[in-house]
Design a protein with these regions (language model features):
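Surface segments flanking catalytic/ligand-binding clefts of nucleic-acid enzymes
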Residues: 2-200
Length: 200
């Protein structure tokens, strides 16, 4: 078993600082670029995968969406007892300035935590919706095909008030390649549940 809630060892800021300290060495500019593209706060690999696909630049194979905050706590204490049972809720992906949330429904996580976790997730989603957040859901099936992921990206782009950048054939090829590199791990991350990887 893996505990994805373990404290992180290094932040993007600290890694960028280390690269700045050895600025004359080979590879530091690439390290700084990686820091700019990193998503911090992921609670599992299957949050990282859609996060990268959705936010990496189109030239890198992503959809180029604005980076969200991952697992960022929202204070809802003022609504406790009326719209919420909690002091805070923590969505998987949060675009706070746009009031948009994306929740990843993990088969493995829910299988190990049972219906209680499903109920908590439903209450959290309802709380966020009641507070005016536009709440989107992603499942293993949603992410299991590139067309499914593309639809989710278009829906999120619309909610964020933007349009996806048109792609060239080369960028489409890079997107399929990135998807295939990230998604083969999905069988291990879903508790052995096999899903179809379809890039058509």
């Amino acid at each position: 078993n893996v505990d994805y809630r373990a404290p992180r060892l290094l932040s993007a800021e600290r890694l960028a600082g280390a690269a700045d300290e050895v600025a004359t060495m080979q590879g530091t500019s690439r390290a700084r670029r990686v820091c700019e593209l990193m998503l911090e706060g992921s609670a599992s690999p299957m949050e990282t995968v859609p996060g990268l696909m959705l936010t990496l630049p189109v030239d890198f194979g992503g959809y180029g969406l604005e980076k969200p905050q991952l697992n960022h706590s929202i204070d809802v204490l003022a609504y406790r007892g009326s719209l919420s049972d909690w002091d805070a809720v923590t969505p998987d992906f949060l675009w706070a300035a746009h009031g948009v949330v994306l929740e990843y429904d993990s088969v493995k996580f829910h299988a190990t935590r049972g219906t209680t976790q499903l109920e908590r997730d439903a209450v959290r989603a309802n709380t966020l919706t009641a507070l005016g957040y536009r709440t989107f859901r992603a499942t293993v099936q949603t992410l299991g095909t590139l067309p499914g992921l593309a639809l989710l990206a278009r829906q999120l782009a619309h909610a964020l008030g933007t349009e996806l950048e048109p792609t060239t054939p080369l960028q489409d090829l890079r997107r399929r390649k990135l998807y295939l590199q990230l998604m083969p791990k999905v069988r291990n991350l879903t508790g052995g549940n096999s899903i179809l990887i379809n890039t058509l």
